[in-house]
Amino acid sequence: MKKILVTGGCGYIGSHTIVDLLENGFEVISVDDNSRSTTYAMGAIEQLTGKKIRNYTVDLKNYDATHNIFSENKDITGIIHFAAFKAVGESCEFPMKYYENNLFSLINLLKCVQEFNIPHFVFSSSCTVYGNPDSIPVTEAFPVKKAESPYGATKQMGETILQDFSKVNSTSSILLRYFNPVGAHPSILLGEVPLGKPMNLVPAITQTAIGKLPKMFVWGSDYPTRDGSCIRDYIHVCDIANAHTLALQYLIEKRNSTNCDVFNLGSGDGVSVLEAIKMFEAVSGVSLNYEIGPRRSGDVVAIYANNDFAVKTLGWKPKYGLNEMMDTAWKWELKLKNEKIGV
């Protein structure tokens, strides 16, 4: 059984990926400093899989503490690196916090990868690396343009660091550029536990619907899109999680064409903010109180994926549609309220 280290394992995507890894026969350890997550996910993972996961409560910016994880686990086969700050708007307000956290943690990990000869590394990247693309859908061959936010810039820099690292080390790597993960595990035992105000659309929708927020804002209605609001590619978190398992299997089986392959992870469908709101209202039966606000700094106008490369090469096939994304997100929000999770 191959051991995988998941960074950010208590977080939204990390926790769902741990479940998928365990269901596919991997052994998993986690590291998460819980600065933007809670330990709730570890209990939910055990409930779903029957397996207790060790989580190291370590800040990856602390090199010595990070190094100790590798010293205690010299049989790590691969790393999936999720741990990062990820809010576009916040990154525009506090850019140095994002550069320090997202880049120092990656560099410390790669120092340990080099010392302990870890063979496989999967990097959680983002469609933000494409900036405002000249056309859509975007393929992996599209140029990486000037980032629209410091968050996007940290993902671009992280990709460059890993590509340069892979040229001179034996570690095989994959960059997974994913679009907008939403929804919750279909069991509704696991989902995104909110800390502070929501930074992304779907948590803002569900928290407004349940009354946690008095209203939500649609940032911008004058974009050159079909209804004036931004267009995004929403993908169910379980589909994203499964792609990470497939990416690791792809590396372990030595099917990679280069030492650092790149894949888009999106549904391939562009959905506007207003269309997402309408879908939620249809699924939940709740009418949302929302207000049109000004454009928000750092937001890309429209982007969605061409996912052909991941589908053909990894054998990945997204299973969940937008209605299921909204349905599981809403059921999870109801669970959060009823069970006072994250309060």
Q: Model-predicted segments: where are they?
A:
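Short, flexible, glycine-rich and Lys/Arg-enriched loop motifs at helix boundaries
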Residues: 39, 180-200, 211-232
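N-terminal Rossmann-like NAD(P)+-binding domain of SDR-like oxidoreductases, especially those catalyzing
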Residues: 1-184
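C-terminal substrate-binding subdomain of Rossmann-fold SDR/epimerase-dehydratase oxidoreductases
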Residues: 58, 204-343
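Short regulatory "switch" loops immediately downstream of catalytic or recognition motifs
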Residues: 66, 183-186, 247-254
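Short-chain dehydrogenase/reductase
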Residues: 99, 148-156, 191, 195-199, ...
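Short glycine- and Lys/Arg-enriched binding-loop motifs that mark or flank ligand-binding interfaces
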Residues: 4-10, 127, 148, 179, ...
